[in-house]
Curated annotation (Swiss-Prot):
Protein species of origin: Thermofilum pendens (strain DSM 2475 / Hrk 5)
Protein name, entry field: tRNA N6-adenosine threonylcarbamoyltransferase
Taxonomic superkingdom: Archaea
Residue numbers binding Fe cation: H115, H119, Y136, D294
Swiss-Prot/TrEMBL catalytic activity: L-threonylcarbamoyladenylate + adenosine(37) in tRNA = N(6)-L-threonylcarbamoyladenosine(37) in tRNA + AMP + H(+)
Length: 336
């Protein structure tokens, strides 16, 4: 670390999609506070402009509550970290604007954080697994990745829509509402008949758009019970991801697997991964529910790791990056 033995204290801001969060964490892994507020659309899916309006509205309260719960002021933190991407442009701008304001007003360094990498780092911290293969699944992301030669390398990802988006869209179209994943899974557990649906794995990548289209068509045709369509959809979608994860373990020779991201709360996916990992004699870690979805603490902790190794950005250069990939980011705080 560039700052000796003292653990650095960083305030982190998350606003990439439907959640606005503020966390405070140290570079040694202490999570001091984690306060989040989630936008829930009244109808349909997430609308970026509405989500951004929500973030702007709740930001002062969330920030104030986080500081109060942690018992500190902005003056007492060493830096301000913010998720600059990937994510929805209007939402990202809310968090970036607040972070820039705090950095300038209180004279604090500004630390750019990749949202996806923050999911990986908070899961490393909370599971205690040092060098796993990650299955990162959320509404906006689906990838299998692991650390290699200074970066997180992608060993498989969706070629079109993310898994979470696939299930959320299906749920919305059939009237189950938002969030869709738990509601689809609830009906899937009542399914009795598996109906073959498109299973699309291309090399190490997956495709969910065709699966979604066929599942919706099947339901609308009236030829199958909704419970059976949900069961078939979940079974197919998750099995594709498990196949890619197993290939990544085989290719890298690693024995640890971590499930992270919002869909990490899925008991069905967890059980499928657990059986696969146990068959290989490996170890499965799962990020705790409070850190599975988007949250401010993961930005604060990852920001603290980055800042302790000299990462910072001038305010005038802190542009949002809606399509920022994990493999574009050098990871100076990891040697292996």
């Amino acid at each position: 670390m560039l700052f000796g033995m003292r653990a650095l204290k960083v305030l982190g801001i998350e606003s990439t999609a439907h959640t606005f969060g503020v966390g405070i964490a140290t570079s040694s892994g202490d999570i001091l506070v984690n306060v989040n507020h989630t936008y829930v659309p009244r109808h349909g899916g997430i609308k970026p402009t509405e989500a951004a309006e929500h973030h702007s509205r709740v930001a002062p309260k969330v920030l104030s509550e986080a500081l109060q719960k942690a018992g500190i002021s902005v003056e007492e933190v060493d830096a301000v970290a913010v998720a600059l991407g990937p994510g929805m442009g209007p939402c990202l701008r809310v968090g970036a604007t607040l972070a820039r304001y705090l950095a300038l007003k209180f004279g604090k360094p500004l630390v750019p954080v990749n949202h996806a990498i923050a999911h990986l780092e908070i899961s490393r911290l909370t599971t205690g697994l040092e060098d796993p293969v990650f299955v990162y699944v959320a509404g906006g992301n689906t990838m299998v990745t692991t650390f290699n030669e200074g970066r997180y390398r992608v060993f498989g990802e969706t070629l079109d829509i993310p898994l979470g988006n696939c299930l959320d869209t299906f749920a919305r179209e059939v009237g189950l509402g938002f969030p869709g994943v738990p509601r689809v899974e609830e009906l899937a557990l009542k399914g009795r008949e598996y109906i073959p649906l498109p299973y699309t794995v291309k090399g190490q990548d997956v495709s969910y758009s065709g699966l979604l289209t066929h599942a919706l068509s099947l339901y609308r045709s009236g030829r199958a019970r909704l419970e059976d369509v949900c069961y078939s959809l979940v079974e197919t979608a998750y099995s594709m991801l498990v196949e890619v994860a197993e290939r990544a373990l085989a290719h890298t020779g690693k024995s640890q697997l971590v499930l992270t991201g919002g869909v990490a709360r899925s008991r069905i996916l967890l059980e499928k991964l657990r059986r696969m990992v146990e068959d290989r004699g490996g170890v499965l870690g799962v990020v705790p529910p409070e850190y599975a979805g988007d949250n401010g603490a993961m930005i604060a902790y990852t920001g603290a790791l980055a800042f302790s190794h000299g990462v910072r950005v001038p305010v005038e250069e802190s542009r949002i990056q809606p399509y920022w990939r994990v493999d574009e980011v050098v990871i100076p705080w990891r040697s292996r």
